[in-house]
């Protein structure tokens, strides 16, 4: 989600990086910090590490996610296709 929204959140991420006193205050520095934190807490890099792709039902989940009221808080307007792409990237571990 971070990398999907990068072009609209990059300046906000710089402010967060400043607050966190990260050495590298760029978007990439913040992303590296998040990925390192995820590794520290043993959070898998790919959703496919915890769920079988055939069980995911991407179409159904994408529709449900788009209908969720919290989706309106995303910095970018999302389409059903955007949701599907994010789920596919979550499964593969591809960061866009």
Place the predicted regions along the sequence by residue.
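C-terminal charged capping/lid subdomain of soluble metabolic enzymes
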Residues: 10-96
């Amino acid at each position: 989600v971070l990398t999907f929204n990068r072009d609209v959140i990059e300046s906000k991420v710089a402010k967060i990086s400043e607050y966190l006193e990260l050495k590298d205050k760029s978007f990439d520095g913040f992303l590296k910090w998040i990925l390192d934190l995820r590794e520290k807490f043993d959070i898998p890099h790919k959703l496919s590490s915890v769920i079988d792709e055939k069980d995911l039902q991407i179409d159904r989940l994408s529709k449900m996610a788009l209908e969720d009221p919290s989706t309106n808080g995303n910095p970018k307007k999302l389409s059903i296709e955007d949701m599907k792409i994010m789920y596919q990237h979550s499964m593969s571990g591809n960061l866009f």
